[in-house]
Structures are given as C-alpha cells and as structure tokens.
C-alpha cells in the first residue's frame, strides 16, 4: 500500500476512534454512577438521550492531530524521516531505505528543513484523494466515443487500484488473516499506532464500540465489505 494512502486511512480510523471513545452523555452518566457506588448506594442506570443532543460528528482538526501524533514519536511538533519510517514499519508497510523515507518527507517539506510540521502534514493529507486520481492517462482521439471509452477505462482503473489499496489496508488490521477484523485485532493496531484511551491501552470494549459503528450484520467483526463501506463514508 502506498504510504500516502495509509495516512488517509489512518484519518478514518482516528475519526472512528474519537467517535466511539468520547460520548459526553455516557461519560457523565458513568461518573455519577461511580460516585453513588462509592457512597454505598445501589445504582440502576437507564441510559437516556436528551432530545436536544445530536450524534457527535468527527472533528477533522482533532482527527488530523491524532494522526500526526502517531508519527511524531517524541512530541516535538515535527515528523522526521526516521519517525515516518518507523511508523510505517510498525504497520508492516515496508520502506526500502532511509532515502525513500527522506524522499516522502521532501515531497511536502515546503521550507526544506527536512521535517514535516502540522501545516505541511495537512497539505499532504488533503491532497491524497487527488493524488489517487492523477495516474497517467494515454491520449486518445478526441471523439465522443473515445472520450466515453477513456472515462470508463479511468473509472475501472481507479476502482481496481482502490480495491487493492483497501485490501492491503484491511490486511494490516486482520492479524490472523481469517478475513475478519476483531476487537482484539483492532486494539493491537491502535496500540501500535500509539492511540490509547486516557493514556492507557485501548480497552476491548472501546474497540467493540468502534466496530459496532460499521458492523452491518451484527457479528461483532468487520468484514472486508464493511471495511470498504466504512472507508467510503470517512472519505466522503
């Protein structure tokens, strides 16, 4: 999988992570329940949703910051070529050499300091969908039939390319290669990326919440088809 596309997929994952792990109503209810239990009261909680509450929407700025922090290992606000190379290796994405990692950095390093800051990272992240559509095209005679044929060929090429990329991304999460992503497998990937809830290891329950957002058949797993639908939504 192209390392640049990986950044886009991580953005979708982080959006799901933030949606599943931060529900204000759930947190307030849990805090109140804990206080009353500490005071010795028997507590029965019935979850209710206030009429004025709306489902939490992903915050693009916050999600981008989470993705950035997974690569910025030392937290200094910059991504080095070495940090980029190490992050990709954690996910099983091979980088052939340090020079290749440096070349990836150089592609967006506007001030030529050898580092990627958050602004350069945003420019890279926003450009990824456009890059996917910029493959080389062979010129054809400019006729209506030729234009229609070229458009169909482009759509087919793009669909095949996206299918391959998504399959490779899916395989990163599917640790045992059974064709399904479990909560445990998702937690392992989150941990490898440094995405931890409240500074600790991602709880399996939180990973189940993430899966529930995209699990259309209710089996507690994410199939490849569900994974593709998920990525279609987060890229929209």
From Swiss-Prot:
Residues 49-60 have a biased composition (Basic and acidic residues). One of its GO terms (molecular function) is calcium ion binding. Residues 59-94, 96-131, 161-196, 202-236 form the EF-hand domain. Signal peptide: none annotated. InterPro entries: EF-hand-dom_pair, EF_Hand_1_Ca_BS, EF_hand_dom, EF_hand_pair_protein_CML-like. Residues 43-64, 130-158 are annotated as: Disordered. Ca(2+) 2 binds at residues 109, 111, 113, 120. Potential calcium sensor. This is Probable calcium-binding protein CML30. Keywords: Calcium, Metal-binding, Repeat. Ca(2+) 1 binds at residues 72, 74, 76, 83. Ca(2+) 3 binds at residues 174, 176, 178, 185. The gene is CML30. Residues 146-158 have a biased composition (Acidic residues). PANTHER family: EF-HAND CALCIUM-BINDING DOMAIN CONTAINING PROTEIN. It comes from Oryza sativa subsp. japonica (Rice). Ca(2+) 4 binds at residues 215, 217, 219, 221, 226.
């Amino acid at each position: 999988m192209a390392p640049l596309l990986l950044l886009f997929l991580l953005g979708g994952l982080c959006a799901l992570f933030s949606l599943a792990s931060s529900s204000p109503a759930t947190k307030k209810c849990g805090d109140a329940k804990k206080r009353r239990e500490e005071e010795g009261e028997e507590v029965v909680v019935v979850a209710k949703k206030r009429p004025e509450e709306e489902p939490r929407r992903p915050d693009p700025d916050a999600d981008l910051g989470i993705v950035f922090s997974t690569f910025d290992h030392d937290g200094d606000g910059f991504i080095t070529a070495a940090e980029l190379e190490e992050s990709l290796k954690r996910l099983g994405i091979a980088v052939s050499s340090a020079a290749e990692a440096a070349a990836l950095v150089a592609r967006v390093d506007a001030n030529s300091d050898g580092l990627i800051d958050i602004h350069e990272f945003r420019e890279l992240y926003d450009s990824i969908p456009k890059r996917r559509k910029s493959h080389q095209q062979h010129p054809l005679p400019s006729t209506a039939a030729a234009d229609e044929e070229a458009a169909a060929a482009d759509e087919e090429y793009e669909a095949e390319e996206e299918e391959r990329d998504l399959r490779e991304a899916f395989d990163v999460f599917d640790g045992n290669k059974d064709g399904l992503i479990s909560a445990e497998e998702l937690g392992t990937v989150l941990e490898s990326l440094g995405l931890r809830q409240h500074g600790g290891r991602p709880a399996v329950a939180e990973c189940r919440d993430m899966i529930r957002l995209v699990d259309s058949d209710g089996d507690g797993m994410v199939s490849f088809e569900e994974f593709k639908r998920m990525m279609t939504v987060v890229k929209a």
